[in-house]
Amino acid sequence: MKISGGGRCNVTHACFDARELTRRYPRGERALIAPFKQFQAADTVAWFEQRGVKLKTEADGRMFPTTDSSQTIMDCLLNLANHAGVKLKTNCDVQSIVKAAGGGFELTLANGKQMPCDKLLLATGGCRTPALGQLAISLGHTLEAPVPSLFTFHVETPWLRELAGVSLEAVEASVPGAKLRERGALLLTHWGLSGPAILRLSAWGARELHDRNYQFALQINWLPDANPEKLAAAFQTCRRSQPAKFIVNTPLAKLPSRLWEQLVIASGIARETRWAALSGAGQHRLIQQLLRSEFPVTGKSLNKDEFVTCGGVRLNEINFKTMESKLCPGLFFAGEVLDIDGITGGFNFQAAWTTGWLAGRAMAES
């Protein structure tokens, strides 16, 4: 929480229709329909505001505390827990959990001490390694193998890396041969590609890209609102209106000048080529480069603001009205320990707030 959203804490997303909200989850969409009808993003906003924490909405729908500080959210939760008499035990690893003979559970801590409880909530976070899911497995649950989600792409193409820092508001990224296509902002980095379009693509393709060992072809459409006919007409206009100008010096459609220059050169058009001298073959190659640039992805890096995994406790083993285990009465689950993950933008926090609220209410009432 402290480092999420660049240290500002992306609490939730301004998507206040429960069914629409579920569509932001590559894993867990169907399971979250009923829970979001009980507690969704609007309820999260109201919950925090009733406790003195106001949220603001940014242009892309992400919601943050008005203080722009994760500490505000942390202080709110810690103060409420303290007021409720919650005891926080840190540096207190749980080594094992067993069902107690007389009901409830017996926890064995790393220091050898035993801790009994009547009901138990597992909210251990994403299972970044299989070991983190062992507590759930020991109580009879099945773990969908964890793999990374929300990661950036390594691309070795030299000219692309030279453009580190260049950003675009809207491109379309896709993986040929897969049903993976996302539109959004893109950031060129010294290791390859990042930004919302890439992060969302990585979330929807988490398992498929893992199975490809993160080595695949990526296509970028730099002008998703254009088509070959529109570009051909624009080039013809340039031939007539500025025939003596060098193509590399006259970016089209407000593309960043450095990017335009590299795309022209990558199309096999010499730097000294003027618009009047642009051949039909050169025009075709440039249109292809603008609409279907292809790059070999050679690996991934985790997004530094979010540590999200695809995978976790199998959803058909959970009662989503209460978040109680169907296999082990008295055991509850919440958050990313479940096989639920959302795209970037506050959706993973929202799933945690919702499942935590349902589990807490059910544990208190049962």
Segments the model singles out, each with a brief description of its role:
Residues 63-71, 150-158, 300-317:
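Flavin (FAD/FMN) cofactor-binding core of flavoprotein oxidoreductases
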Residues 94, 114-128, 135-137, 186-191, ...:
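Short hydrophobic core segments
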Residues 123-139, 339-366:
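A conserved FAD-binding loop/helix module that cradles the flavin
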Residues 2-87:
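Conserved N-terminal/central alpha/beta ligand/cofactor-binding core
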Residues 2-3, 12-18, 54, 142-147, ...:
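An anion/pyrophosphate-binding glycine-rich loop and adjacent beta-alpha core
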Residues 90-104:
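A conserved short coil-to-beta-strand element within the FAD-binding core of flavoproteins
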Residues 119-161:
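Glycine-rich loop(s) and the adjacent beta-strand/alpha-helix scaffold that form part
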Residues 90, 262-341:
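A glycine-rich dinucleotide-binding beta-alpha-beta segment and adjacent secondary-structure elements
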